[in-house]
Curated annotation (Swiss-Prot):
This is Ajmaline N-methyltransferase. Optimum temperature is 30 degrees Celsius. It comes from Rauvolfia serpentina. Keywords: Alkaloid metabolism, Membrane, Methyltransferase, S-adenosyl-L-methionine, Transferase, Vacuole. GO terms for cellular component: cytoplasm. SUPFAM superfamilies: S-adenosyl-L-methionine-dependent methyltransferases. Residues 134-142 are annotated as: SAM motif II.
Amino acid sequence: MAENQEALAEFYDKGVGVWDNLSREHMHFGYYAPGATATIGGHRASLVRLIDEALCFAEFPDDPEKKPRNMLDVGCGIGGTCLHVAKKYDIQCKGINISPEQVKIAQGLAAAQGLESKVSFDVGDALDMPYPDGAFDLVLSIHCIEHLQDKEKFIREMVRVAASGATIIILSHVHRDLSPSEQSLKPQEERVLRKIGSSVQAWFCPLSNYVSLLAPLPVEVIKIADWSRNIDPSSRLMLKVAFSVKGIVSNLMKGVQGWTAIKNVLPMKLLHKALHDGLVKFVVLTCRKSN
């Protein structure tokens, strides 16, 4: 395993539990109508809505006869997406994660929900996945590609394991695209991204890079959308809870994991501001592997 991948695995191992008081088995933002107010009581519904909205955007078939045979979640966290998709859509789901600790938790959640026959999880590297070519009808990734420096290899691997005609979905933070007159981001913008990235093991690029990386690959029907305003209420709520007295005390009671949680929350304030300022965006990209 490459050195930066080992660091990423350690980061995720230690980061388990950062959002579990609010997000439970999901390690991503929720989806809301722009301008909505997020509430703790309704937050879990917004988390699964993000998954459903992504599938809808990718034109997930309503006809049960045309639904995918199986799904791969690349960078699956503690398994929430696989568990939701397996239950709601009744398809086989597999998750891969570089963090042994998170895979262990995901396996426990699957067992607790009686889904061992429909859901499984592997410890593995997203840049070198242990699956044959064309193994999956749906390949999805949420909040993973921004944590990897070699984005070209990541995208190639997603396309490689996708079957002919399979749907590929990527949800990710990116930085703003450059204007025609710009050669690079402003120095202050680069400093902000470095500060966020160094804290949460992330390397940001513009959305146009993803499209360019897909261009030479056997894919078609590329669709993109900016969902920054849709996750804004979720981001606000997560920060509010994390910085509340209850949130801080709850994390401190977790010992080492709690200190890690607090350290990981601090750059979230920078990320939220970068989203508000338009420096960072949250996007969805889908495409279909050519037949």
